[in-house]
């Protein structure tokens, strides 16, 4: 956690320095933009962290997940025991375990605190995977929790949101001044229209950056699953996903933390939260050699 906070502070400082440089190049006095920077930080991080803090409740509600408090059968008992053992190995508190109705083979982890997270699996996963494969999937999700991926993603999204808000308004003001000759005066409708377009454009680039990081994070979680359950089991689980693949039906709020994120071609690949299964399997096989 301390490492992520330090990295977060350094990244924010870099964003503010870069914003100041951009403003200077565009002829904007950075000292007059302090209000914008404060506003951008507040709005940039508010949504990310509110979503993070509410992520468990949102995930349970949107998927209709049933949390296993007392196991009703041997399968649920095995799930609890397996997750407890894996959580102990990586040194985190045991997450809540839940099952949600879904024909697709998938699972996800979420939560703001690595010692109070949620791991959920679909009924489709339990019905179509062997116990070894399920163990590997659980290890993958436990690795997400242990790595603090949910917090890291929220921090990254907050930084990018801040950058988008600041840059759209600075560049928008510069363009508006060029078009209208209005330098430093009251802004008209054109300025706000330009800012809206720039926010959409910069937001697309920010999403691409977030999804690129998410794809890198999946390789690390696969390695975690291989460590906790065994490399062959992790490879077998991913191969099973490849046989039963399709578009992910998980809610958007938790899709990035599922074991499987769907497929895409061309430019759509840039907006996928997960790498192709073939690349993930190849990475595990190379690491085994």
From Swiss-Prot:
Native organism taxonomy: Bacteria, Pseudomonadati, Pseudomonadota, Gammaproteobacteria, Lysobacterales
TM ranges: 5-25, 33-53, 155-175, 193-213
The family this protein is said to belong to: Belongs to the peptidase M48B family.
Membrane disposition: Multi-pass membrane protein
Binding site for Zn(2+): 140, 144, 218
Protein name per the record: Protease HtpX
Upregulating conditions: Constitutely expressed in rich medium it is induced at 37 but not 28 degrees Celsius in minimal medium.
Active-site annotation: 141
Biological process, per Gene Ontology: proteolysis
InterPro entries: HtpX_protease, Pept_M48_protease_HtpX, Peptidase_M48
Record keywords, A-Z: Cell inner membrane, Cell membrane, Hydrolase, Membrane, Metal-binding, Metalloprotease, Protease, Transmembrane, Transmembrane helix, Zinc
Top-rank taxon, per record: Bacteria
């Amino acid at each position: 956690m301390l490492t992520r906070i330090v990295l977060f502070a350094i990244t924010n400082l870099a964003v503010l320095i870069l914003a100041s440089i951009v403003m200077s190049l565009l002829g904007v006095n950075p000292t007059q933009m302090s209000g914008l920077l404060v506003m951008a930080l507040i709005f940039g991080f508010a949504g990310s962290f509110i979503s993070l803090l509410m992520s468990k409740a949102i995930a349970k509600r949107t998927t209709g997940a049933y949390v296993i408090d007392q196991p009703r059968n041997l399968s649920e008992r095995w799930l609890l025991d397996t997750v407890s053992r894996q959580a102990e190995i990586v040194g985190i508190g045991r997450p809540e375990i839940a099952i949600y109705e879904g024909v697709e083979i998938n699972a996800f982890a979420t939560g703001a605190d690595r010692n109070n997270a949620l791991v959920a699996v679909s009924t489709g996963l339990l019905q179509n995977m062997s116990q070894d494969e399920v163990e590997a999937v659980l290890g993958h999700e436990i690795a997400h929790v242990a790595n603090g991926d949910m917090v890291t993603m929220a921090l990254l999204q907050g930084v990018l949101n801040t950058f988008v808000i600041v840059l759209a308004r600075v560049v928008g003001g510069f363009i508006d001044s060029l078009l209208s000759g209005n330098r430093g005066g009251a802004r008209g409708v054109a300025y706000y229209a330009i800012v809206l377009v720039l926010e959409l454009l910069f937001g697309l680039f920010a999403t691409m950056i977030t999804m690129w990081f998410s794809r890198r994070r999946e390789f690390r979680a696969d390695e975690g699953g291989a460590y906790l359950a065994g490399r062959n089991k992790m490879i077998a689980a991913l191969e099973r996903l490849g046989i039963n693949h399709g578009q992910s039906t998980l809610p958007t709020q938790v899709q990035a933390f599922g074991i499987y994120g769907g497929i895409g071609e061309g430019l759509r690949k840039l907006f996928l939260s997960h790498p192709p299964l073939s690349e993930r399997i190849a990475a595990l096989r190379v690491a085994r050699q």
